[in-house]
Curated annotation (Swiss-Prot):
UniProt xrefs under Gene3D superfamilies: 3.40.50.12470, 3.40.50.970, Multifunctional 2-oxoglutarate metabolism enzyme, C-terminal domain, TPP helical domain
This protein's name: 2-oxoglutarate dehydrogenase E1 component
Top-level taxon in the UniProt lineage: Bacteria
Signal peptide: none
Cofactor(s) required, per the database record: thiamine diphosphate
Amino acid sequence: MAKQEQAPDRANDVFALTSFLYGGNADYIEELYAKYEDDPNSVDPQWRDFFAKLGDNADDVKKNAEGPSWTRKNWPIAANGELVSALDGNWAEVEKHVTDKLKGKAAKGEAKGAAGTPLTAEEITQAARDSVRAIMMIRAYRMRGHLHANLDPLGLAEKPNDYNELEPENYGFTPADYNRKIFIDNVLGLEYATVPEMLDILKRTYCGAIGVEFMHISDPAEKAWIQERIEGPDKKVAFTPEGKKAILSKLIEAEGFEQFIDVKYKGTKRFGLDGGESLIPALEQIVKRGGQMGLKEVVLGMAHRGRLNVLSQVMGKPHRAIFHEFKGGSYTPDDVEGSGDVKYHLGASSDREFDGNKVHLSLTANPSHLEIVNPVVMGKARAKQDLLVGRTRDDMVPLSERAKVLPLLLHGDAAFAGQGVVAECLGLSGLKGHRVAGTLHFIINNQIGFTTNPAFSRSSPYPSDVAKMIEAPIFHVNGDDPEAVVFAAKVATEFRMTFHKPVVIDMFCYRRFGHNEGDEPSFTQPLMYKAIRAHKTTVQLYGEKLIAEGLVTQDDIDRMKADWRQKLEGEFEAGQSYKPNKADWLDGAWAGLRTADNADEQRRGKTAVPVKTLKEIGKKLVEVPKDFHVHRTIQRFLDNRAKMMETGEGIDWATAESLAFGSLAVEGHPIRLSGQDVERGTFSQRHTVLYDQENQNRYIPLNNLQKGQAIYEAINSMLSEEAVLGYEYGYSLSDPRALVLWEAQFGDFANGAQVVFDQFISSGERKWLRMSGLVCLLPHGFEGQGPEHSSARLERYLQLCAEDNMQVANVTTPANYFHILRRQMKRDFRKPLIMMTPKSLLRHKRAISTLAELSGESSFHRLLWDDARYNKDKGIKLQKDAKIRRVVLCSGKVYYDLYEEREKRGIDDVYLLRVEQLYPFPAKALINELSRFRHAEMVWCQEEPKNMGAWSFIDPYLEWVLAHIDAKHQRVRYAGRPAAASPATGLMSKHLAQLAAFLEDALG
């Protein structure tokens, strides 16, 4: 009995040691075993021995091969097309395919045995098995070859454990088999090859200076394309003599630029590219090859490392301008105001021409917050792609059109692995509404993050591993082999232009100096910096290679270096007296717009729309095609809206919004609304996209208003705030004539994108002179829903307000909402708008407007009067101004709480004044209004806790206004919730008690 128990264990040990047998091969093992049971001589002797050892317990091994019972058999589905695509473990299929081919060749006399006679059946079987083993070995190189590639220029990286996965012996080949030609059916570009011939191609392709990861890609066409592009006897990295000299020239420029600045500005921060100079010829190759394949524009985003080099050597920014900035000079013309930013954050744009193809390059300005520029670049690229097609386009732009604009992102290794926004952007890459036909990611992998070693900055072997989740091909390459780097850049560009998918280049290099030039890296990385000090520069190494090839002499190289240094000296002299004279931020799509230089000017814009036009739009908003099956609740919604249009009364929030969108679209302004659940609206209020209840077809009334209108896009975004808001901000930078809106699901969640608000939206214009008309809709209001569904943290945005940088509003009527949205497009400048939007007011009986309030001479009102003044037949009648005892100023939904409480109590000597726009603060308008009530007590009422909401922001402004009008009461009294750590209570009883308390305080 004991013997029988041991037999399957032994067999399982044999099975476990056979590395190419795993769960995916269960079918193959079963098929072989079935053959063996019928006729033991029909299988290879090794398999015969293996199966013989199983005794009667084959089921045990079969189970072992199949894996656990809960896995789904035959999943994932194998891609069994051509042989190249069938190499994913379905070996039975491969063997059958090869056997059939060999039989065909034998029949034609093309395949002969060792004696020169036609192949026997046994020889065909043996040859087929040789083929399968060879293909298994080839597949192993494709899967794991990158782990054995020569990637680290310093040679410090630990070699991975070698499990002999790539050894021919592992696949049953002994040295005695090395001279035998094996049929591999044009895999590796050869029909027949010996084992050494295969190894030569495989090692050169997968274990040289480039390591390619692509076997995680599920699309057989993409995988086959990469194999076809890099495998084969004629697929070596090869450049013409002119190409090699061009690479050398660019390397000399890159290295010489850094060395020149190091001499002239010793110790000044420049975040040099020293050690990663191969980036510069690689970027040139991307632009050049892209241009040949139809690329028109590149939008770049990058961190500080090497930025000045990219600006000057790739973007063509004048060196004298950079030297002027190093001297401390401004990058803006004298007549332009702005707070400025450090030189390694600034953007630029230029046109480059290669082989007659002109490509426009723009480098996006960015903060030091790593990787946050990524979504901004993607959004900018998307807008530029849309502009290529036009504002009246259909909603689906072909990816082949989008591919004409390339987002190109440069990353640091530690940041790419560490920052969550990277994964968010990868998540956006394939989504409708956010696709950009593939971003090219270039990681400058200097194997350190400030002072942090890779072992402490990521849990995966490579910084690029996060990109595997979207099946992006990854090209790891040794930065000290410039030809390999340029080749990788070329293939990566071709892949992106062919498949319109993201692609990653991971260039292993090093950082010759510290994190910045005033830093001492040996404190924390002594061994690495010992190796770096002894290591030749990339220019030295490549120069020696070209000298050995007889292409150049040392004198040629010295002359090239001297000429470049002389050019830089000339630019340095010119930089002493350089004056910037071109303000490029109002070029191109921004032509015709201006900066808003006078905070006191009238900024209403012509936002009213004739009633006739509004009714025409309203009619189209409620029409659906005859054969379209609308949900019955939606039909009721449409019927109610139709009544509003007929009567011109009772216009609610969502209808006013749709009329604003529709009127702008008819006037030629595209609308782009993005965020979680925006098609329907978080509170089921919007319904701008209708779904057929029978077949789920979509119908968008706002895109069916009239011929030639601009497009309306509502994009239900992924569940991210940071990347999506960054993306929409980027979009608004490229198309100032599109109304771009981002809506938070609840305003509480907007702080997931706080970096974008802080570094871009609130400060981008002052730092980089880049305007944005982005609208942020943040649902806000205290209704007893708890601390996570009550507050958009209005105070945060108000704290960011200064220097006329953005607008913050908390409006209370659909009409004012209509006008403030249209105002974004109806002025000749752009400012971001942060809107606290309502929840309960969406269906509040008092929060309604009339069509008359959207038309005629109407416009946005920063202050709104007390409704009781002109709703004469409703509720209480207010006393005359002189008899008003108290003025309660407020903003947002709390107005309606105050109004209803006052009505309930019959109070007629308290006036409610709404501040609809909190910033820019309407000081002059308030002076005019409050002058009527000089003797009244002044109260500021808010529903937010005292340390939140508008109180801290508005108090000094109101004090200034009261002093100005010589009011009896010089201080404003606070009425609202007491200061709190958490924004709101989650208990309805407590919420109502707090509400009653502060209403009593405000009105009593």
